[in-house]
C-alpha cells in the first residue's frame, strides 16, 4: 500500500482524501490552515464541505509540508492553479529527492501571468518526477458522497497512468487512462470560462436553446485552442472535454457557473469573488486565454465575450447580441 500525501484541504483535497481512505489507502493531508486540519482530524470540514462526515482519525493531518512529504510515494496536488507555483516551490526546496514519487494534479486552470497549464508549471520546479492529471466531470461534493463518477487520468507514461488508475478506482469512482496530458489539462482549464457563460444564461431564465448552443459552440473553441497546443481531438470529445464541460455548465455545484449567474443579475465581479469561499478558476483563466488566443490568432468569440463581460464591463445581454449578429458562416471549417 503506497503512502499518499494530499497537498491542500479544500473541497477537492478533502473529497479525494475521503475517497482514498474509503478505498483502503493510507492518506496524509497537508494545509497551511491549522484550524482546518484540526477539523478534518475530528471528522469534518465546515469551510468547504460542511455537510460531509469524514472518517475521523483515518486521515492523517500534517501542518508541515516537509513532514507531510516524508515517505510519500504519491503526492496529490489539490491547490488552486494560481497558487500552485508557491506549493511546488516549497516541494522543490524540501528534502524530497525520490524520483519514483508520482505527482497527481487535481487543479484545473491556466496561470494568469505566464499562461501555463499545471504540467508546464510543474516542469519548472520538479522536472524529472513522474506527473499526471486527474480530470473529468467530478464535483468534489458528489465524489465525497460516493455518487458514481467517471474521470480520466492523463499522463505521458502509460505505466504510471495504469498504476494510478488502479489506486483510485472503486465501485463508485471509475478511472480511464489517456496519454494526451496536454489535451486533458487544457480541457479541464478552459471549460471553466464557458461555465461562466452558462451561468449568465441561467441568470436570465430557462433559456435552454441558448445554453445548448453555448455548450456546443464552446466545445468547438476548446478544440481549436487545444489542438493548437498539440492536444488530440478525441480527448476533447471524451470525459475530460465534453464531459467536464457539460457538468460545469449545468451543475448547481459549479462555482464558475455561479459567477456568471450573479453577473447577469447585476452583481459586480469584485463583490461576487469577495463573497465566495472557494476559487472560481474560470475568472483568471478567461484573462489568460483571451490574451493568448488574441496573440496566437485563435478564433474564440465566446471566450472573448466572456472576458469582456468580466473585465471590460460589457453588459451580458449586449455580449449575447453581438455573438448572435456576427458574420454568418458554415458550422464547420478548418
Swiss-Prot record:
SUPFAM superfamilies: 6-phosphogluconate dehydrogenase C-terminal domain-like, NAD(P)-binding Rossmann-fold domains. It is found in: Cytoplasm. NADPH binds at residues 11-12, 32, 108, 140, 255, 279, 281. Keywords: Cytoplasm, Lipid biosynthesis, Lipid metabolism, NAD, NADP, Nucleotide-binding, Oxidoreductase, Phospholipid biosynthesis, Phospholipid metabolism. Pathway: Membrane lipid metabolism; glycerophospholipid metabolism. One of its GO terms (molecular function) is glycerol-3-phosphate dehydrogenase [NAD(P)+] activity. GO terms for biological process: carbohydrate metabolic process; glycerol-3-phosphate biosynthetic process; glycerol-3-phosphate catabolic process; glycerophospholipid metabolic process; phospholipid biosynthetic process. InterPro entries: 6-PGluconate_DH-like_C_sf, 6PGD_dom2, G3P_DH_NAD-dep, G3P_DH_NAD-dep_C, G3P_DH_NAD-dep_N, NAD(P)-bd_dom_sf. The active site is at residue 191. One of its GO terms (cellular component) is cytosol. The keyword Oxidoreductase applies. Its EC number is 1.1.1.94. Sn-glycerol 3-phosphate binds at residues 108, 136, 138, 191, 244, 254-256. Belongs to the NAD-dependent glycerol-3-phosphate dehydrogenase family. NCBIfam families: PRK00094.1-2, PRK00094.1-4. Catalyzes the reduction of the glycolytic intermediate dihydroxyacetone phosphate (DHAP) to sn-glycerol 3-phosphate (G3P), the key precursor for phospholipid synthesis. This is Glycerol-3-phosphate dehydrogenase [NAD(P)+]. The gene is gpsA.
Amino acid at each position: 500500500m503506497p503512502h499518499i500525501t494530499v497537498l491542500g484541504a479544500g473541497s477537492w483535497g478533502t473529497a479525494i482524501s475521503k475517497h482514498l481512505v474509503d478505498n483502503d489507502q493510507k492518506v496524509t493531508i497537508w494545509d497551511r490552515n491549522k484550524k482546518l486540519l484540526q477539523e478534518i482530524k475530528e471528522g469534518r470540514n465546515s469551510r468547504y464541505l460542511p455537510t460531509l462526515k469524514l472518517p475521523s482519525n483515518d486521515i492523517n493531518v500534517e501542518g508541515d509540508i516537509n513532514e507531510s512529504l516524508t515517505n510519500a510515494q504519491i503526492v496529490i496536488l489539490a491547490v488552486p492553479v494560481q497558487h500552485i507555483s508557491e506549493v511546488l516551490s516549497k516541494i522543490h526546496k524540501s528534502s524530497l529527492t525520490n524520483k519514483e514519487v508520482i505527482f497527481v494534479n487535481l487543479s484545473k486552470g491556466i496561470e494568469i501571468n505566464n499562461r501555463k497549464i499545471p504540467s508546464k508549471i510543474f516542469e519548472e520546479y520538479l522536472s524529472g518526477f513522474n506527473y499526471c492529471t486527474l480530470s473529468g466531470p467530478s464535483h468534489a461534493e458528489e465524489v465525497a458522497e460516493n455518487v458514481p463518477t467517471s474521470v480520466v487520468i492523463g499522463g505521458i507514461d502509460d505505466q504510471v497512468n495504469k498504476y494510478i488508475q488502479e489506486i483510485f478506482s472503486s465501485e463508485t469512482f471509475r478511472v480511464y487512462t489517456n496519454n494526451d496530458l496536454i489535451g486533458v489539462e487544457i480541457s479541464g482549464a478552459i471549460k471553466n470560462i464557458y461555465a461562466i457563460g452558462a451561468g449568465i444564461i441561467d441568470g436570465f431564465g430557462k433559456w435552454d436553446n441558448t445554453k445548448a448552443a453555448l455548450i456546443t459552440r464552446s466545445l468547438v473553441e476548446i478544440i481549436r485552442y487545444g489542438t493548437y497546443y498539440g492536444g488530440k481531438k478525441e480527448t476533447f470529445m471524451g470525459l475530460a472535454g465534453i464531459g467536464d464541460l457539460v457538468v460545469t455548465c449545468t451543475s448547481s455545484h459549479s462555482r464558475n457557473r455561479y459567477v456568471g449567474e450573479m453577473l447577469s443579475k447585476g452583481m459586480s465581479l469584485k463583490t461576487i469573488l469577495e463573497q465566495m469561499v472557494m476559487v472560481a478558476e474560470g475568472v483568471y483563466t478567461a484573462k489568460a486565454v483571451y490574451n493568448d488566443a488574441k496573440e496566437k490568432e485563435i478564433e474564440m468569440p465566446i471566450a472573448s465575450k466572456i472576458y469582456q463581460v468580466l473585465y471590460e464591463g460589457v453588459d451580458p445581454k449586449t455580449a449575447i447580441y453581438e455573438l448572435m449578429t456576427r458574420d454568418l458562416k458554415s458550422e464547420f471549417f478548418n
